[in-house]
Amino acid sequence: QDLLAIDEIVMYGSNTDEMVAEIKDRYPNRHCIIYPDPASRQRKTRAGGRTDLSILQNAGFSVKAKNSHALVRDRINAVNSRLLSSDGGRHLFVSPKCKQTIKSLERQTYKEGTSVPNKDDGYAHTNDALGYLGEYLFPVRTEYATPQPQRWT
């Protein structure tokens, strides 16, 4: 199944209420499904102690959020598997209108010697957002064998 990024909203220094207003203004009378950070269940905004998730739900959006965060590597793998699957297929297509998304996918860096995204380069936020969507719809899990304790012989 393909994932199409056809538009983006980039707002610096905004809050959830402002984002809701922008979505409703830009896409009136549309059914919108939001895939937020799972922390939106607990995170309180500056506006009266409401959670980000409750603001989105009360605005009439369908909200799809897991109860807890997937591992960062699982979110990255979910997006990467859409960019290029194991069979060589491409399943993530980004419109040229999505300038920040394209820039973020091209320029994301990682902390030296790790697979941990560098949050200081200005590109992580857009990729995080794409990761929550990708991991919710197309989860990729790496199962690691649990080592069994060995008895001394």
Each language-model region and where it sits:
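Short, glycine/acidic-rich hinge or "gate" loops at secondary-structure transitions
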Residues: 145-147
